[in-house]
A protein has these predicted regions:
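Short, surface-exposed ligand-recognition loops at beta-strand->loop->(often short) alpha-helix junctions
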Residues: 9-20
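A short, structured loop/turn motif at beta-sheet edges
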Residues: 12-13, 46, 58
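Short, histidine-centered active-site or binding-site loop motifs used for metal coordination
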Residues: 7-10, 54
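Short hydrophobic/aromatic beta-strand element in the GNAT-like acyltransferase core
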Residues: 3, 37-38
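A short beta-turn/loop motif at secondary-structure boundaries
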Residues: 40-45
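Short amphipathic
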Residues: 7, 92-97
């Protein structure tokens, strides 16, 4: 299992638009590139962070080579129009060494 953490700064007032684009895009990425899904977190000052899981590094790299260009153009445009230019960054990527999340409690 491979994990990636992303960070964005969203333009004030466009948070719902960003979340809608992110949500639809994440679903397409899972369907088209084999991603295992993601969790989105909202911080202060318009900062959003997502934690994504992939079956392996090769699957993630393949998706990144296409800039994760999935088939939902509307979702991609919502997402792009909501983020501050140049604010996207990959904070971390690497293999999962231990997984102690208890999803039964959620």
């Amino acid at each position: 299992m491979f994990a990636v953490i992303y960070r964005w700064r969203v333009i004030a007032g466009r948070e719902a638009q960003f979340e809608a684009g992110w949500r639809a895009g994440t679903e397409r990425i899972a369907a088209e590139f084999g991603g295992w899904g993601s969790r989105l977190h909202k911080g202060e000052g318009g900062v959003f962070v997502a934690y994504a899981q992939w079956p392996d590094e090769a699957a993630w790299k393949h998706a990144m080579e296409t800039r994760m260009r999935h088939s939902d153009d509307e979702a991609r445009q919502k997402y792009r129009d909501a983020i501050e230019p140049g604010s996207f960054e990959t904070l971390f990527c690497g293999p999962v060494l231990a997984d102690l999340l208890d999803l039964k409690r959620a």
